[in-house]
């Protein structure tokens, strides 16, 4: 089966990168025997300096075409036209040797909208996977909603990466997506946790230091927990770093909260393997890949009722804190400290392997393609 993945591109003079979710799916499908190519659009504004135009290259053993355009900040009519032209150019370049895809699979609203307008009279089935947090609401902004409706209308199948996102898409567009999650690299996160060997209980968290992740709530809850020797390690960086550092001092936990910044997956996986519990109390999560990566290492997790994780967190792998506030989160963290060893790290890891590994997601997608 020939599959064209339509992805977000992030390109400069020195490197070519794709959105990680799209690349992970492309690699999974290729490993499952599909003939996969990638057509990517870099539609960021001129502030993200890079060469304008098209480029052909190979990445991870796949033919790739990238077209750079500048349309993201423009009004819908103008940006839509530019995006469509960029998509047509990408399709022309990626198929310039006569290759014809059986399936064109676009990811994210803006990219899907651009390729929907560029399909022409192709016989290929058109599939859209929605990941965007902008659609994870019952009232998307007008531009995003228009792009989504245009793409979904032309799609043979719409996929959402979580049940919460699917419900919001149905509410705002009337389209009922099928749910297929993102791929998690189970090879990187394969070493199961042995728990902390440092003499104190270790909570760990991961996410961008931005408002929606509510690390201020997590730190406040951490300061309220019973065990004053426990540690909290946080991976990620962002605009709230200085504010959160100051909050640690104010709460009296600066010596027990460790900020690790952005780190490669391999570094994060090593920390998960010597931690006891993963905890993150986001306001909203479209999917929740950080939870899945932690679970892949066998860690039980604590989450707020934030959407995406509610589709996979259950009594066998963690706790969902309903109507989450600092007191309720602290109570959940206290309880988890007492019962964390009762969870089976192997069972938690197996759940991830069965549902979010490259093999599992590739099988779901190929079965879906064949059903169209």
Where is each model-derived feature located?
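Conserved donor-binding/catalytic core segment of Leloir-type glycosyltransferases
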Residues: 4, 195-213, 219-222, 233
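Nucleotide-activated donor-binding/catalytic signature segment of Leloir-type glycosyltransferases, i.e.
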Residues: 245-263
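Short alpha-helical donor nucleotide-sugar binding micro-motif in glycosyltransferases
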Residues: 262-263, 270-275
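Conserved acidic donor-binding segment of nucleotide-sugar-dependent glycosyltransferases
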Residues: 315-326, 335-341
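Carbohydrate-associated surface elements
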Residues: 164, 183
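Aromatic "clamp/platform" in nucleotide-sugar-dependent glycosyltransferases that forms part
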Residues: 283
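N-terminal subdomain of nucleotide-sugar transferases
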Residues: 1-52, 359, 370
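Short hydrophobic beta-strand element within catalytic cores of glycosyltransferases
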Residues: 300-303
């Amino acid at each position: 089966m020939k599959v064209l993945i339509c992805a977000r591109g992030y390109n400069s003079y020195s490197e070519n990168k794709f959105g990680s979710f799209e690349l992970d799916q492309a690699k999974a499908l290729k490993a499952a025997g599909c003939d996969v190519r990638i057509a990517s659009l870099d539609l960021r504004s001129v502030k993200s300096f890079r060469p304008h135009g098209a480029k052909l290259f190979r990445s991870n053993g796949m033919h790739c075409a990238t077209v750079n355009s500048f349309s993201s900040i423009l009004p819908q009519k103008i940006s839509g036209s530019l995006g469509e032209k960029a998509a047509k150019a990408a399709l022309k370049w990626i198929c310039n040797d006569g290759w014809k895809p059986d399936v064109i699979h676009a990811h994210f609203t803006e990219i899907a909208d651009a390729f929907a307008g560029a399909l022409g009279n192709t016989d290929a089935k058109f599939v859209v996977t929605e990941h965007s947090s902008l659609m994870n609401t019952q009232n998307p902004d007008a531009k995003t909603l228009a792009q989504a409706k245009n793409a979904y209308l032309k799609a043979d199948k719409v996929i959402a990466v979580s049940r919460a996102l699917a419900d919001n898409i149905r509410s705002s567009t009337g389209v009922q997506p099928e749910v297929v999650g993102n791929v998690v690299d189970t090879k990187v996160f394969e070493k199961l946790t042995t728990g902390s060997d440092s003499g104190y209980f270790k909570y760990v968290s991961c996410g961008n230091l931005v408002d929606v992740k509510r690390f201020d709530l997590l730190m406040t809850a951490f300061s309220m927990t019973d065990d004053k020797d426990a540690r909290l390690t946080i991976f990620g960086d962002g605009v709230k770093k200085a504010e959160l550092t100051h909050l640690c001092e104010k709460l009296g936990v600066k010596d027990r909260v460790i900020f690790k910044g952005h780190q490669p997956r391999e570094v994060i996986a090593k920390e998960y393997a010597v931690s006891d519990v993963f905890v993150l109390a986001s306001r909203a999560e479209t999917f929740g890949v950080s939870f899945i990566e932690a679970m892949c290492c066998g860690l039980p997790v604590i989450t707020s009722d934030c959407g995406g994780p509610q589709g996979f967190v259950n009594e066998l792998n963690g706790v969902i804190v309903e109507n989450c506030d600092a007191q309720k989160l602290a109570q959940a963290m206290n309880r988890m400290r007492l019962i964390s060893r009762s969870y089976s790290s192997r069972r938690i890891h197996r759940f991830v392997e069965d549902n979010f590994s490259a093999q599992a997601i590739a099988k779901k997608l190929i079965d879906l393609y064949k059903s169209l």
